[in-house]
From Swiss-Prot:
Gene encoding the protein: PPC16
Gene3D superfamilies: Phosphoenolpyruvate/pyruvate domain
Domain of life: Eukaryota
GO MF annotation: an example: phosphoenolpyruvate carboxylase activity
Name under which the protein is recorded: Phosphoenolpyruvate carboxylase, housekeeping isozyme
Enzyme Commission number: 4.1.1.31
PANTHER family listed in its UniProt record: PHOSPHOENOLPYRUVATE CARBOXYLASE, PHOSPHOENOLPYRUVATE CARBOXYLASE 3
Keyword Phosphoprotein: yes
Membrane-spanning intervals of the chain: none
Length: 967
């Protein structure tokens, strides 16, 4: 191959320009960025692995690009033959190269987005999550509310300062990229950004170029594969690193922008520092649903670690604040306090373990005296948490630390009041205000940890108790009897059980978790979430167990409804719960309900799940109103469309009217955390997007659907569910086909999360977790769970009455919920390719199932055509040239990885599959070994032929990076 005529072979750079002939906009530098990173990468590849391998990568890319041009399946076969002819080491290098190039393409795109001038799209236009054109900008939102919606500035200000967005970080599905690589990616992004800055000197340029090369090489030389599964503590540390890197500084920066935006509409005061605009919670180390690795001890560790990190972050800023507040003028209250502190601290005035202000602070610097005391207590708070974490005990008495936020805020508020009283408000509104806002947002625990547990586990505990008390089996009681017993116990005072209760491992685990909640400070925790909740007794059971385990300030109990039947029954269950007097008195007019997007989608398909979630929210809000309760909806959205993902602000703006009402909780899932908080500007945009969309939804709710639209949706949902279930649950060939046609069985090898892929080890689709279910279909680019059901539903109503097509088009144009639902599926079709799925079938599926695969692909094409008709589009994504351009740029890389994956799966599953290795032409074949062979040694324990397992995992990671969603 080395002597092949290279003139004919266009470089990848030229290929890119052929694929995307036109710039999308004036400032479109995407192709330029992409080409620069790839040129650098190919140079590195040649240096490390020789010209032959570089040419192989280019040849592979070219075949892939030819397939993308004409979709000729013969090209896939040629590509397959070329890839399978590589030896083990080379095949790992090729898979690694394409995975790496996709990561670089993502980085080029992020830099482009950060720099592109925002092209205003008309409201409601859909574009991808990461696209700069789909902003909910806080300034524009405020202006729009005042100018277009005729709201008074004061109304807007009141609504804004009373609203709360609580972002809940979860570990699953875990980011499939290792943290070691994420950090290198961040540096590549920064270098690329600086390279294209306007005022760069030739020397700067040369140094940045070298730095870029260095980081690309370092990333390529890092093992992308996690060799051991992460523990929940690892996941928690990974999640917390975003606070350190971006969120901690990002929150006060964002709140300053809100102040500025308010000023621009004529409000001359700032958002109060204690207004809970943004809150953060976490599930990492608290979510034990189906994850046996999250033990009570893990929960305790995670809370202590977060407390230590919070104290450390405050501690790292306090000396800067002491430098800033050097004033001597202060009010009487502060003067008295500073004098007291000065008198009491004379004895031990030298503190050598501090870097600044280590000697006694003179009395004419009262702010510093007071902040010096805050610093001492922060230091002790951090050290005590560290001791407890490392040894389980600490010699530092608790009273020398901060135990609640109020005592931490008090001296800071005193400084703030004093500065304002002395005419120094401008100084007070500097770093001190930022610090106060951080304390209000993050408290002493950094995040509040939610606890999540399956309802059956609580039932088991209560069953053990009732049997021990010899009053029967709780498990066998009717719902009425359960409620009656729980309420009589909750109204009484006597303890239910003593230390003599016989406990299995599972029961001890549940009770120990409640003991940890009782032992740690209240501000460590958020909600107690019950998954698979179906009845009021599920909620009352947790209330009783909290009391029995001496939880002084019980956590709010949040039922999670996720299966279709549970969503349908949720409003009635909530009404029954609110009709219990004891419970209504307990909740003080506030209730939270979580709705799950992923399991409802797996259970009934995306169409019916989306509509049922919409209706359930409307009904739940009505029930809450009836009982005078303020309801907060907690949205458990995944990162992928199949699990309820998609652009944040559009998802918020398409919720039913009155369901958000200024308080929103939403999960930010593992693989989306990096896209939301990976960098300062991303963090800023995420906070802005959630805040602006929540405000707009509350003050200018979307329209309610017309009665005829509802009737049509109800009818279509029945058909969609029928079709989905007839294939997924009733078709006898389906499970076998799914296992053969996708890498589902091999998913567990990726070590992406601490949680097992299945709730129970044996069983069919229903026991599979939603994440691997979606992941497997995403890998083959067939995306079945997202679109299955839509086609049958559209077809049914259009055949019934041809005028319905106009009704559907009217719904698409006027109703945000319907539009977002359709647009998300259209985006997934743009990322799909049934030709690739057919290749997996041909290689991996037994011949008697081929006709079934063809039937599914026919349904795919029919659904796509109907969808375009409803949206009034001739072509996929015609309304979004940005996204279309970005997907076109990636397709050739992803296709290579798909072909590589399909053939690798074939070789793993069929060891007798015959491949023809090509002869070595390069000089290296004479040598004993070449650099690529070292890669095989990274996985010495694989049960397959050398190199196969790593090649497979690299293709999985690469495809996930290319499609920008994993599970």
């Amino acid at each position: 191959m080395a002597n092949r005529n290279l003139e004919k072979m266009a470089s990848i750079d030229a290929q890119l320009r052929l694929l995307v002939p036109a710039k999308v906009s004036e400032d479109d530098k995407l192709v330029e960025y992409d080409a620069l990173l790839l040129d650098r990468f190919l140079d590195i590849l040649q240096d490390l692995h020789g010209e032959d391998l570089k040419e192989t990568v280019q040849e592979v890319y070219e075949l892939s690009a030819e397939y993308e041009g004409k979709h000729d399946p013969k090209k896939l076969e040629e590509l397959g033959n070329l890839i399978t002819s590589l030896d083990a080491g080379d095949s790992i290098v090729v898979a690694k190269s394409f995975s790496h190039m996709l990561n670089l393409a993502n980085l080029a795109e992020e830099v482009q987005i950060a720099h592109s001038r925002r092209n205003k799209l008309k409201k409601g236009d859909f574009a991808d999550e990461n696209n700069a054109t789909t902003e909910s900008d806080i300034e524009e939102t405020l202006k729009k509310l005042v100018v277009d919606m005729k709201k008074s500035p004061q109304e807007v200000f009141d609504a804004l300062k009373n609203q709360t967005v609580d972002l809940v970080l979860t570990a699953h599905p875990t980011q499939s990229v290792r943290r070691s690589l994420l950090q290198k990616h961040g540096r590549i992004r920064n270098n690329l950004t600086q390279l294209y800055a306007k005022d760069i000197t030739p020397d700067d340029k040369q140094e940045l170029d070298e730095a870029l090369q260095r980081e690309i090489q370092a990333a390529f030389r890092t093992d992308e594969i996690r060799r051991t599964p992460p523990t929940p503590q690892d996941e928690m540390r990974a999640g917390m690193s975003y606070f350190h890197e971006t969120i901690w500084k990002g929150v006060p920066t964002f709140l300053r922008r809100v102040d500025t935006a308010l000023k621009n509409i004529g409000i001359n005061e700032r958002v109060p520092y204690n207004a809970p605009l943004i809150q953060f919670s976490s599930w990492m180390g608290g979510d034990r649903d189906g994850n046996p690795r999250v033990t009570p001890e893990v929960t305790r560790d995670v809370c202590l670690l977060a407390r230590m990190m919070a104290a450390n972050l405050y501690y790292s800023q306090i000396e800067d604040l002491m430098f800033e507040l050097s004033m001597w003028r202060c009010n009487d209250e502060l003067r008295v306090r500073a004098d007291e502190l000065n008198r009491s601290s004379k004895k031990n005035s030298v503190a050598k373990h501090y870097i600044e202000f280590w000697k006694a602070i003179p009395p004419n610097e009262p702010y510093r005296v007071l902040l010096g005391e805050v610093r001492n207590r922060l230091y002790q708070t951090r050290e005590r948490s560290r001791h407890l974490l490392a040894h389980g005990y600490s010699d530092i008495p608790e009273e020398e630390t901060f135990t609640n936020v109020e005592e931490f805020l008090e001296p800071l508020e005193l400084c703030y009041r004093s500065l304002c009283a002395c005419g120094d408000r401008a100084i007070a509104d500097g770093s001190l205000l930022d610090f106060l806002r951080q304390v209000s947002t993050f408290g002493l625990s950094l995040v509040r940890l939610d606890i999540r547990q399956e309802s059956d586990r609580h039932t088991d505990v209560l069953d053990a108790i009732t049997k021990h008390l010899e009053i029967g089996s709780y498990q066998e009681w009717s719902e009425e009897k359960r409620q009656q017993w729980l309420l009589s116990e909750l109204s009484g005072k006597r303890p239910l059980f003593g230390p003599d209760l016989p406990q299995t491992e599972e029961i001890r685990d549940v009770l120990e978790t409640f003991h940890v909640i009782a032992e740690l400070p209240l501000d460590n925790f958020g909600a107690y979430i019950i998954s698979m909740a179906t009845a009021p007794s599920d909620v009352l059971a947790v209330e009783l167990l909290q009391r029995e385990c001496h939880v002084k300030h019980p956590l709010r109990v949040v039922p999670l409804f996720e299966k279709l039947a549970d969503l349908e029954a949720a409003p009635a269950a909530l009404a029954r719960l609110f009709s219990v007097d004891w419970y209504r008195n307990r909740i003080n007019g506030k209730q939270e309900v979580m709705i799950g997007y992923s399991d409802s989608g797996k259970d009934a398909g995306r169409f019916s799940a989306a509509w049922q979630l919409y209706k359930a929210q409307e009904e739940l809000i009505m029930v809450a109103k009836q009982y005078g309760v303020k309801l907060t909806m907690f949205h458990g959205r995944g990162g992928t469309v199949g699990r309820g993902g998609g652009p944040t602000h559009l998802a918020i703006l398409s919720q039913p009217p009155e369901t958000i009402h200024g308080s929103l909780r939403v999960t930010v899932q593992g693989e989306v955390i990096e896209q939301s908080f990976g960098e300062q500007h991303l963090c800023f945009r995420t906070l802005q997007r959630f805040t602006a969309a929540t405000l707009e939804h509350g003050m200018h709710p979307p329209i309610s659907p017309k009665p005829e639209w509802r009737a049509l949706m109800d009818e279509m949902a029945v058909i969609a569910t029928e079709e989905y279930r007839s294939i997924v649950f009733k078709e006898p060939r389906f499970v076998e086909y799914f296992r053969l046609a996708t890498p589902e069985l091999e998913y567990g090898r990726m070590n992406i999360g601490s949680r097992p892929a299945k709730r129970r080890p044996s069983g069919g689709i229903e026991t599979l977790r939603a994440i691997p279910w979606i992941f497997a279909w995403t890998q083959t680019r067939f995306h079945l769970p997202v679109w299955l059901g839509f086609g049958a539903a559209f077809k049914h109503v259009i055949e019934k009455d041809v005028r319905n097509i106009h009704v559907l088009q009217e719904m698409y144009n006027q109703w945000p919920f319907f539009r977002v639902t359709i647009d998300l599926v259209e985006m997934v079709f743009a990322k799909g390719d049934p030709g690739i799925a057919a290749l997996y079938d041909r290689l991996l599926v037994s011949e008697d199932l081929w006709s079934f695969g063809e039937q599914l692909r026919t349904m795919y094409e029919e659904t796509k055509e109907l969808l375009l008709q409803v949206a009034g589009h001739r072509d996929l994504l015609e309304g979004d040239p940005y996204l279309k351009q970005r997907l076109r740029l990636r397709d050739s890389y992803i296709t290579t990885l798909n072909v590589c994956q399909a053939y690798t799966l074939k070789r793993i599953r069929d060891p007798n599959y015959n491949v023809k290795l090509r002869p070595h032409i390069s000089k290296e074949s004479i040598e004993i070994s070449k650099p690529a062979d070292e890669l095989i040694t990274l996985n010495p324990t694989s049960e397959y032929a050398p190199g196969l397992e790593d090649t497979l995992i690299l293709t999985m990671k690469g495809i996930a990076a290319g499609l920008q969603n994993t599970g």
